[in-house]
Amino acid sequence: MKNTFKILSLLLSFALLAIACTEKIDDGGVTDGGDQMSFLISLPEAVSGAAGDIVSVKFYSGKGPKEGDSVVLKKGSSECECEIVAITANNFSFRISPQVSTGKYTFSIKRGAQIKTIGEVNFTIEKRVEIVEKEGYNVYGLISCDGVGVPGVVVSDGVEVTTTDKDGLYYLKSDEYNRLVFMSVPSGYETITDTCIPKFHKVLDGNSKTTERADWQLTKVDNKDHVMYLLGDMHLANRTNDASQFATFLADIKEQIKANKSKRQYALTLGDMTWDLYWYDNVYDLSVYVDMMKKKLTGLQIFHTIGNHDHDMKEVGDFNTVTLYKKVVAPTYSSFNIGDVHYVVLDDILCENTGTGGSGRKYKSTLTTDQLSWLKKDLSYVDKSKTLVITMHAQMYNEGGSASLSNASELASLCSGYKTHVMSAHTHVICNNDLSASNGIMHHNSGAICCTWWWTGYYVPELNICKDGSPAGYYVYQMNGTDVKWRFKPTGRDFNYAFRTYDRNKIVMTAANFAPNASSTGVTNFEKSASSWSASSKDNYVYINVFDYDKSWKIEVTENGKSLTPELVSIKDPLHLVTYEAKRYNAGSTPTSDFKARTVTSHIFRVKASSASSTLEISVTDRFGNVSTESMKRPREFSINEYKK
């Protein structure tokens, strides 16, 4: 077989269209009549594929086609009908008719004698190279670059793993349980991108008795040295002014994209891009998130990790909760290669919910045996000289360094021999565990873009902080070959904003001072939570919250030239107490238990000064030699306005 092929790219961009039931429904002016046809459809603006391909379309609020309906495509005087092959609660799929040619078509739904026009779709019809099917293999395809097949590309259905042959062809024996197939994008290439969403997986029909073809086209790039942005919890839900606050993050990361324009750049989320509680109430699910990101953040590919709030908790169990995610975002677990780094995305959220929402929203943090089995196969194709980056939503290890993931030891065993970085989020705190000496793993828990579900920024726009006191932000990883360097980037602040200081002598945290309108119950609860900071003090302690601290960092404090010794303490961050809990109690509300200030913050230090009015010189140096300093003039007031500066 020749190894030169021509295939066209697949582009899908969505525009939400609301169609009123009283409008004209086609150029002939036929009206709905007695059987009303009302649609709320997210229509593809462009579709590229071949005759017989299945195209999936999303609809909202149950306003989609019914059984027996069909799709009618009209271009000029030419008209054809496409079969609707499947309808679910919020999606329908149709098969591209052999009569469709490249061009713009009017897209309508036909029901009996009635037709409702939805909008227009641009079709690009591919002329695919014929591939000889192999008996016993039901999923197959071609991966090429500039018309030439790319050999050695890893392809999987989440269970079976194979590679392309010398002509870029692959064949899989798939039970199609996961209803998808994906490739592990090879080093030195990029896959087609739908604005900012890399297209490296295809949804299958789930019928292992039929054959299905999935092709990908790659572009050759130099990405050995690259930048990866790690993005923790976003919790976008159309509430608490989150869109406006998220715009601040978007502006910030766009500045970083400009600053790093000499390198290839990518982003990787760490889960909870959305908030399942508001998928239906606020009409903000994953498809809305994807549509927003495609409009608001371009110039880099964004890979994704699934979080617990990215599952549809109205479904029962685990498998059906991720149907929408797999359709519009990505597989729940997969891998890809950029330069000398092998990235693995895992799903460590196993849902056990009843499908009723509310108290039925149950899950545990673990990796399924299917994932671990797949990962073992995937890593068999990855040389030990490569750097391994694994992302998951919930932590592998907790702040004390003990296992948080139920099968952390099994995962660590699979990573043996690799220099491994594990990135997580979930808890909305920053925590680093360097376990490289024992098992080769550096574990990073990465804070949150939304901090405290956007509440602190809602109450005090200049102080959007997490429950450990760390500011809203994200990570910038510089990947140079196998070498990895990183810095935490506070949203709207300079990189050098690496710590925050508190003068204990000036803190008297009472409800009267910070929540004067709280109820009696609110007063009691707040003062119990803030008890470590409620009493006045003259002990001259200064507290330093070093946000991205790990044990390789150096903290130096001097008073009048004399060194003071920092000690790590277990205490709640005082600024989070007054920007979240106090504000909630003051408004007559109850703080969410998950976001009350933590009992243990793993990166607060204190020093004891000799005077209440001395100036302290503070220098913090990270593991890569980046230095942040502050000349702390005391006494320093403790107030919200003081820290808004």
Regions found by a protein language model. Give the residues of each.
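Aromatic sugar-binding surface patches on proteins
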Residues: I87-F94, P574-R606
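N-terminal active-site segment of His-dependent metallophosphoesterases
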Residues: I131-N138, C145-D146, Y189-D281, K645
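Bacterial Sec-dependent N-terminal signal peptides
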Residues: S13-A46, N122-K134
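A short, solvent-exposed beta-strand micro-motif common in secreted/extracellular proteins
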Residues: Y177-T193
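Short, acidic Ser/Thr/Gly-rich low-complexity loop/linker segments typical of extracellular
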Residues: S156-S174
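Extended active-site neighborhood of metal-dependent phosphoesterases/phosphodiesterases
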Residues: T191, P198-S208, W279-K376, S380-V382, ...
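Short, ordered, surface-exposed loop/turn motifs in non-cytosolic proteins
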Residues: K66-D69, Y137-Y140, C145-V159
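Binuclear metal-dependent phosphoesterase catalytic core
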Residues: I441-D548, W553-E556, S602-K608, T615-S631
